Amino acid sequence: MLNRRHLRIKILQVLFGYYQDEERDVVRARKALDHSTMKMKELYLMLLDMVASMQGLAIDRIEAGYKKKLPSPEDLNPNTKFVTNKPLRVLANSKNLRKACESTGVGWANRQELLRAIFKGMLDNEEYQEYMAIEERGFQFDRESLVRMFRKHMVNFDLFQDMLEEESIFWVDDLDLAASMAIKTIKTIKEGDEDVELLPLWRDDDDDKAFMEGLF
């Protein structure tokens, strides 16, 4: 969720634009602030959806191996450790995440090439290769490994960061907080969970939202 420091930064950004504008339209400035915070939520959902999408791409890769005219022994007996990662499966099958993405219009439908590039890069990533190579399993180990792959590869993938700069002026500044929220969400997944609980943009008592409106 948004913290006070991040809120102050957003407010200062909007106020700078407000005082640069000769008309100094308060209503428009408030809308800009609301838009900025909503983009933060969209980025958070996009990051979780990116992680969830990795499972489908991994499954596609395994199925493509089976269909080769001359499949290798690895193609015929693939390592399924990643696709059966339990926290990843919870994310991939999450109704809460799917509903939130649909309601906000967030998704990767128009960015499939980038998504595949992130996945292919992950296959060469040290964290992924170490995870696939060792025999250790267990829910906590799977969850910690997924977080490391996300933090050290997915969110830092160069083409992904380039996309953020092109898509929204807010996302580059929001990335660190959105990524920490995504990691916190993954860490809340417990063994036996059938769905993931998404973090709210504001605290339950709504103090932060009132704080933002009061400062502005």
Which stretches of residues belong to each language-model region?
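Class I Rossmann-like S-adenosyl-L-methionine
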Residues: 1-216
